[in-house]
């Protein structure tokens, strides 16, 4: 269950789920709009369906809003340890929200205002008057034709009634007379019908067959009053039905055709007027529909802006948050902290990460150098005091021992034992003097006095001298050049090489195949001096601290030799690297930067001259 809860929590707040929810919100918003639009067009909105769609839209937007704004409101109302980054995150989200909300609100209000103006313009009173007058003109035209046809029907009926005795028994004359009346009075059709027999007694040439079955009974009954009655059996014609007075159940039907263009115009006018009034009655529905659309668009844009703001905020704030955390660690004294450069893009943030890491490394190195310098300074003071306090009694002890040895050695019976004791005193006194000398040398290491020399010649002489002193060690010297002009303090370089070679010799004590190799290689900007031996090497735990003051693995000495070497090398713009060889032994590499050394010598000369 806990794993399921964690999975659901991560999925609910994932970008994928939020994207799916946004897509669903857009789809349901479209369906809501479509349903309202179709219902409004048909004049019958399905209110239950619209309500369900609106509820679903509301739920989706609420869930989406909660998911998108949860972290924002949580950081806004509940302060946490990331207060600074939360403030920045809130500002960015608020900025994006306002950037979307303000234009959307302005556009929505403007659109609603102009929509109302447009609707008022569409349904202006003048337009209503024009449409109503058009309908009145059409109705007047039809009414006028009906009045004329009514008068014509009365006149024809009267003429036929006057000729009753001539026509009743003469169908041919009846037909001829009816055609004459139709032509004379511009009738499109004239028909005389017998109600009892349901037959046509006479009809004009262009009249179509018509029976009483097509005429409603109430119209026939109404026509019995001998007054014309309108028969609306054909929308393209105006017809009048009237009973002939002198005849028994005989009726006259006359009609005139209406021009098709006029009929089409009347139909179009009536249709437009009906649609106009229908839309006018639904102005409220149109305004509601567009208001809902504007609200949904505003909400959608706001949610999109918030989601975009959250994404952009995470992209910007998370790297800054890591920098803040790293800065807090640095403030608490941890100078080993680094921010992951591979987790950010190669943009300004990436540049900031790289600069931060470089700065922390530089601070760490400076702090380490400061500690070493402070330690060296402290030991320098100690060295001066110790040297002063020890040297004073050592000199008389040494002189007294030498005089005892010269004066009383012949008189002592146990001469060998006496000499042994005195030599032991002298030897240990010399050891103490050497230790004191190292103290003094380290404390008072003078500034280098730069002169030109042949570095190959200097180092070769040192190697040859050490070879004579240690004939049990196989010395070798290799170089890729025969001569190299080098500006340095020759005394200090001699001291460096002697110290390194002595250390190598001491590490070879007890070795059967002792060998020391010195290599010199040059390049365009650097010269490298490498000392290799096949001795014991350095203890792994001391490799990183071998050049620190008073670090040593020997019982004799105070461990300032390599510290002095490092100081001299650095004074000559060099770098000292110490490592163990895979095949056994140690390798010490000195690399001098020739360009930097040349600049330092120039500055040194200017300082001396000035």
UniProtKB/Swiss-Prot annotation:
It is found in: Cell membrane. Its EC number is 2.7.13.3. The modification Phosphohistidine is found at residue 388. It is a multi-pass membrane protein. Residues 385-596 form the Histidine kinase domain. Member of the two-component regulatory system RBE_0470/RBE_0312. This is Putative sensor histidine kinase NtrY-like. It comes from Rickettsia bellii (strain RML369-C).
